[in-house]
């Protein structure tokens, strides 16, 4: 995927607001591959909604969202599975880790499905994030910050 485009998107929760003070909603916007973007808003401003729309968890919006010129409303379940396996990752506020499994097992569960990384690449991510010594520990015994890093590795 090279570009994500939003065209006059408005979350259903904001449908009754004629003009939203936002650079994301009710405007044309493009996110290009390889660039970094900061989406900042007050509580209730729609940051989590945007992520849910882009990951296909929710479709309660008006307007159009495109991945490489393809409207998300046209995606089948299989299309979403393929996109989530290879092209987009989402780290929810609820980390959705399995507390009784080790950090390595939590990451391996997704990688067994996608085969996206080999073991040495995954080990290098643990090292870069400073938690290589936590690989064999149950995630439920790690600090929240350490759990977040495990979830980041799994998402990548």
How would you describe each model-predicted region?
Residues 38, 150-156:
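ABC ATPase nucleotide-binding domain "signature" region
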Residues 63-72:
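Conserved ABC transporter NBD signature motif
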Residues 1-6, 10-29:
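A short, flexible loop at the N-terminus of ABC-type nucleotide-binding domains that lies
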Residues 138-147:
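Conserved ABC ATPase signature
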Residues 72-89:
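ABC ATPase NBD coupling module
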Residues 117-134:
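Conserved ABC ATPase "signature" region
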Residues 55:
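Helix-to-loop junction immediately C-terminal to a conserved catalytic motif
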Residues 99-109:
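Short coil-to-helix segment of the ABC ATPase nucleotide-binding domain corresponding to the Q-loop/switch region
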């Amino acid at each position: 995927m090279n570009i994500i485009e939003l065209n006059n998107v408005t979350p259903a929760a904001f449908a009754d607001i004629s003009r939203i003070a936002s650079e994301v909603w009710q405007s044309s916007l493009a996110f290009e591959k390889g660039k970094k973007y900061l989406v900042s808003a007050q509580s209730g401003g729609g940051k989590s909604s945007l992520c849910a729309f882009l990951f296909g968890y929710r479709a309660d919006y008006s307007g159009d969202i495109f991945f490489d010129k393809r409207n998300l409303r046209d995606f089948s379940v299989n299309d979403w599975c393929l996109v989530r396996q290879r092209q987009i990752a989402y780290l929810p506020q609820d980390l959705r880790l399995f507390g009784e499994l080790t950090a390595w097992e939590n990451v391996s569960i997704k990688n067994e499905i996608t085969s996206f990384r080999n073991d040495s690449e995954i080990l290098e991510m643990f090292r870069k994030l400073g938690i290589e010594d936590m690989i064999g520990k149950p995630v439920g015994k790690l600090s929240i910050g350490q759990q977040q890093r495990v979830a980041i590795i799994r998402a990548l």
